[in-house]
Protein backbone atom coordinates (compact mmCIF):
# COMPACT_ATOMS: atom_id res chain seq x y z
CA UNK A 1 0.00 0.00 0.00
CA UNK A 2 1.57 3.26 -1.18
CA UNK A 3 1.85 5.95 1.50
CA UNK A 4 0.23 9.32 0.85
CA UNK A 5 0.68 12.76 2.41
CA UNK A 6 -2.18 13.87 4.69
CA UNK A 7 -0.92 17.28 5.90
CA UNK A 8 -0.86 16.31 9.60
CA UNK A 9 0.88 19.22 11.35
CA UNK A 10 2.23 19.34 14.90
CA UNK A 11 0.96 22.88 15.51
CA UNK A 12 -2.56 21.93 14.42
CA UNK A 13 -2.59 18.98 16.81
CA UNK A 14 -1.35 21.16 19.67
CA UNK A 15 -4.06 23.73 18.96
CA UNK A 16 -6.69 20.96 18.99
CA UNK A 17 -5.32 19.66 22.33
CA UNK A 18 -4.69 16.24 20.85
CA UNK A 19 -1.65 15.86 23.14
CA UNK A 20 -3.49 16.09 26.48
CA UNK A 21 -3.98 12.67 28.04
CA UNK A 22 -5.60 11.57 31.27
CA UNK A 23 -4.38 11.93 34.83
CA UNK A 24 -1.13 10.10 35.56
CA UNK A 25 -3.09 8.08 38.13
CA UNK A 26 -5.58 6.95 35.48
CA UNK A 27 -3.49 5.32 32.79
CA UNK A 28 -2.74 2.01 31.12
CA UNK A 29 0.97 1.02 31.27
CA UNK A 30 0.61 -0.37 27.74
CA UNK A 31 0.35 3.25 26.61
CA UNK A 32 3.86 4.06 27.84
CA UNK A 33 5.40 4.03 24.32
CA UNK A 34 2.86 6.67 23.25
CA UNK A 35 3.50 9.07 26.16
CA UNK A 36 6.24 11.68 25.94
CA UNK A 37 6.02 13.45 29.32
CA UNK A 38 4.08 14.25 32.49
CA UNK A 39 2.84 17.77 33.14
CA UNK A 40 0.84 18.95 36.16
CA UNK A 41 -0.39 15.44 36.87
CA UNK A 42 -1.38 14.75 33.25
CA UNK A 43 0.25 12.47 30.72
CA UNK A 44 1.31 14.17 27.49
CA UNK A 45 0.80 12.14 24.32
CA UNK A 46 3.70 11.82 21.88
CA UNK A 47 2.32 13.61 18.82
CA UNK A 48 4.95 12.09 16.55
CA UNK A 49 3.30 8.74 17.25
CA UNK A 50 -0.13 10.27 16.74
CA UNK A 51 0.90 11.62 13.32
CA UNK A 52 2.39 8.27 12.32
CA UNK A 53 -0.65 6.16 13.19
CA UNK A 54 -3.16 8.74 11.94
CA UNK A 55 -1.32 8.77 8.62
CA UNK A 56 -1.43 4.95 8.50
CA UNK A 57 -5.15 5.04 9.24
CA UNK A 58 -5.74 7.62 6.50
CA UNK A 59 -3.85 5.41 4.03
CA UNK A 60 -5.96 2.41 5.04
CA UNK A 61 -9.33 4.15 4.70
CA UNK A 62 -8.30 5.85 1.46
CA UNK A 63 -7.47 2.57 -0.25
CA UNK A 64 -10.48 0.84 1.29
CA UNK A 65 -12.79 3.61 0.03
CA UNK A 66 -11.17 3.47 -3.41
CA UNK A 67 -12.34 -0.16 -3.56
CA UNK A 68 -15.89 0.75 -2.50
CA UNK A 69 -15.62 -0.52 1.09
CA UNK A 70 -18.15 0.62 3.69
CA UNK A 71 -17.38 2.31 7.01
CA UNK A 72 -19.09 2.60 10.38
CA UNK A 73 -18.07 5.37 12.82
CA UNK A 74 -18.91 4.86 16.50
CA UNK A 75 -18.68 7.55 19.16
CA UNK A 76 -21.35 8.12 21.79
CA UNK A 77 -19.67 10.23 24.47
CA UNK A 78 -20.82 13.84 24.87
CA UNK A 79 -17.71 15.25 23.21
CA UNK A 80 -18.00 12.96 20.19
CA UNK A 81 -21.66 12.55 19.25
CA UNK A 82 -22.14 15.68 17.11
CA UNK A 83 -18.71 15.39 15.49
CA UNK A 84 -19.38 11.76 14.61
CA UNK A 85 -22.71 12.60 12.94
CA UNK A 86 -21.28 15.50 10.93
CA UNK A 87 -18.15 13.66 9.82
CA UNK A 88 -20.11 10.56 8.86
CA UNK A 89 -22.57 12.52 6.74
CA UNK A 90 -19.72 14.27 4.93
CA UNK A 91 -18.13 10.95 3.97
CA UNK A 92 -21.44 9.07 3.58
CA UNK A 93 -20.45 6.65 6.34
CA UNK A 94 -22.81 4.81 8.65
CA UNK A 95 -22.62 5.91 12.27
CA UNK A 96 -23.75 5.29 15.85
CA UNK A 97 -23.57 8.37 18.08
CA UNK A 98 -26.16 7.93 20.83
CA UNK A 99 -25.95 4.42 22.25
CA UNK A 100 -24.45 1.14 21.12
CA UNK A 101 -27.12 -1.53 21.29
CA UNK A 102 -25.53 -4.83 22.31
CA UNK A 103 -25.39 -7.30 19.44
CA UNK A 104 -25.76 -4.59 16.81
CA UNK A 105 -23.15 -6.39 14.68
CA UNK A 106 -22.84 -9.87 16.19
CA UNK A 107 -26.61 -10.35 16.04
CA UNK A 108 -27.00 -8.72 12.65
CA UNK A 109 -30.22 -10.55 11.76
CA UNK A 110 -31.98 -8.87 14.71
CA UNK A 111 -30.54 -5.49 13.72
CA UNK A 112 -31.81 -6.02 10.16
CA UNK A 113 -35.29 -6.73 11.52
CA UNK A 114 -35.20 -3.52 13.60
CA UNK A 115 -34.02 -1.53 10.58
CA UNK A 116 -36.83 -2.90 8.44
CA UNK A 117 -39.39 -1.93 11.10
CA UNK A 118 -37.80 1.51 11.22
CA UNK A 119 -38.02 1.92 7.43
CA UNK A 120 -41.62 0.69 7.36
CA UNK A 121 -42.65 3.10 10.12
CA UNK A 122 -40.93 6.02 8.39
CA UNK A 123 -42.65 5.21 5.13
CA UNK A 124 -46.00 4.95 6.89
CA UNK A 125 -45.42 8.33 8.54
CA UNK A 126 -44.44 9.97 5.23
CA UNK A 127 -47.60 8.66 3.59
CA UNK A 128 -49.66 10.03 6.49
CA UNK A 129 -50.76 6.58 7.58
CA UNK A 130 -50.12 7.26 11.27
CA UNK A 131 -52.66 10.09 11.20
CA UNK A 132 -55.42 7.61 10.35
CA UNK A 133 -54.81 5.50 13.45
CA UNK A 134 -56.49 5.90 16.85
CA UNK A 135 -54.73 8.66 18.80
CA UNK A 136 -53.28 6.33 21.45
CA UNK A 137 -51.86 3.91 18.88
CA UNK A 138 -50.49 6.73 16.71
CA UNK A 139 -48.76 8.31 19.73
CA UNK A 140 -47.19 4.99 20.68
CA UNK A 141 -45.88 4.41 17.14
CA UNK A 142 -44.52 7.96 16.90
CA UNK A 143 -42.60 7.43 20.14
CA UNK A 144 -41.26 4.16 18.79
CA UNK A 145 -40.21 5.87 15.57
CA UNK A 146 -38.43 8.64 17.52
CA UNK A 147 -36.54 6.02 19.53
CA UNK A 148 -35.56 4.09 16.40
CA UNK A 149 -34.42 7.33 14.75
CA UNK A 150 -32.28 8.18 17.77
CA UNK A 151 -30.48 4.85 18.01
CA UNK A 152 -30.62 3.51 14.44
CA UNK A 153 -30.88 6.67 12.34
CA UNK A 154 -27.17 6.62 11.54
CA UNK A 155 -27.29 3.05 10.19
CA UNK A 156 -30.72 3.17 8.53
CA UNK A 157 -29.22 2.54 5.08
CA UNK A 158 -26.77 -0.16 6.20
CA UNK A 159 -27.52 -3.41 4.35
CA UNK A 160 -24.73 -5.56 5.75
CA UNK A 161 -21.77 -5.59 8.12
CA UNK A 162 -19.26 -2.75 7.66
CA UNK A 163 -15.82 -3.40 6.23
CA UNK A 164 -14.01 -1.07 8.67
CA UNK A 165 -15.17 0.42 11.99
CA UNK A 166 -13.75 3.67 13.38
CA UNK A 167 -14.13 3.97 17.16
CA UNK A 168 -13.92 7.11 19.30
CA UNK A 169 -13.35 6.43 23.02
CA UNK A 170 -12.27 2.82 23.40
CA UNK A 171 -13.53 2.54 26.98
CA UNK A 172 -17.07 3.70 26.27
CA UNK A 173 -17.32 1.71 23.05
CA UNK A 174 -15.73 -1.47 24.41
CA UNK A 175 -18.77 -3.60 23.49
CA UNK A 176 -18.64 -2.37 19.89
CA UNK A 177 -14.91 -3.07 19.77
CA UNK A 178 -15.38 -6.60 21.09
CA UNK A 179 -18.10 -7.29 18.52
CA UNK A 180 -15.72 -6.21 15.76
CA UNK A 181 -12.98 -8.44 17.15
CA UNK A 182 -15.40 -11.39 17.31
CA UNK A 183 -16.41 -10.88 13.68
CA UNK A 184 -12.92 -10.07 12.41
CA UNK A 185 -13.88 -6.56 11.29
CA UNK A 186 -10.80 -4.26 11.16
CA UNK A 187 -10.93 -1.35 13.62
CA UNK A 188 -9.32 2.05 13.89
CA UNK A 189 -9.55 3.46 17.42
CA UNK A 190 -8.81 6.84 18.90
CA UNK A 191 -7.11 5.88 22.18
CA UNK A 192 -6.35 8.04 25.21
CA UNK A 193 -3.70 7.26 27.83
CA UNK A 194 -6.05 4.98 29.79
CA UNK A 195 -6.66 2.63 26.84
CA UNK A 196 -5.17 -0.61 25.52
CA UNK A 197 -3.45 -0.03 22.15
CA UNK A 198 -3.39 -3.76 21.41
CA UNK A 199 -7.17 -4.10 20.98
CA UNK A 200 -7.43 -2.31 17.62
CA UNK A 201 -5.83 -2.90 14.24
CA UNK A 202 -4.72 0.74 14.15
CA UNK A 203 -4.67 2.70 17.42
CA UNK A 204 -4.32 6.49 17.16
CA UNK A 205 -3.09 7.99 20.47
CA UNK A 206 -5.07 11.18 21.09
CA UNK A 207 -7.22 13.07 23.58
CA UNK A 208 -10.68 11.46 23.47
CA UNK A 209 -12.35 14.00 25.79
CA UNK A 210 -11.86 17.25 23.85
CA UNK A 211 -14.21 18.07 20.98
CA UNK A 212 -11.43 19.79 19.06
CA UNK A 213 -9.19 16.72 19.28
CA UNK A 214 -11.96 14.38 18.15
CA UNK A 215 -12.88 16.70 15.27
CA UNK A 216 -9.25 16.92 14.16
CA UNK A 217 -8.85 13.13 13.97
CA UNK A 218 -12.23 12.58 12.32
CA UNK A 219 -11.68 15.37 9.78
CA UNK A 220 -8.45 13.74 8.60
CA UNK A 221 -10.05 10.30 8.35
CA UNK A 222 -13.19 11.41 6.51
CA UNK A 223 -11.12 13.54 4.12
CA UNK A 224 -9.12 10.41 3.27
CA UNK A 225 -12.34 8.41 2.84
CA UNK A 226 -13.79 11.07 0.52
CA UNK A 227 -10.58 11.16 -1.51
CA UNK A 228 -10.74 7.38 -1.81
CA UNK A 229 -14.32 7.45 -3.08
CA UNK A 230 -13.45 10.24 -5.55
CA UNK A 231 -10.51 8.22 -6.88
CA UNK A 232 -12.90 5.32 -7.47
CA UNK A 233 -15.22 7.59 -9.49
CA UNK A 234 -12.32 8.85 -11.60
CA UNK A 235 -11.34 5.36 -12.69
CA UNK A 236 -12.11 4.71 -16.39
From Swiss-Prot:
Provide this UniProt record's keywords sorted from A to Z. Answer: Plastid, Ribonucleoprotein, Ribosomal protein
Any one Gene Ontology molecular-function term assigned to this protein's record: structural constituent of ribosome
Gene Ontology biological-process annotations: translation
Matching entries from Pfam families are given as: Ribosomal_S2
Protein's cellular compartments: Plastid
Keyword Transcription regulation attached = no
PROSITE patterns the record matches = RIBOSOMAL_S2_1, RIBOSOMAL_S2_2
Q: Cellular component GO terms, alphabetically?
A: mitochondrial small ribosomal subunit; plastid
Q: Which family, according to UniProt? A: Belongs to the universal ribosomal protein uS2 family.
User: What HAMAP family does the database record attribute to this sequence?
Assistant: Ribosomal_uS2_B
Annotated protein name in UniProt: Small ribosomal subunit protein uS2c
Q: What is the lineage of its organism?
A: Eukaryota, Viridiplantae, Streptophyta, Embryophyta, Tracheophyta
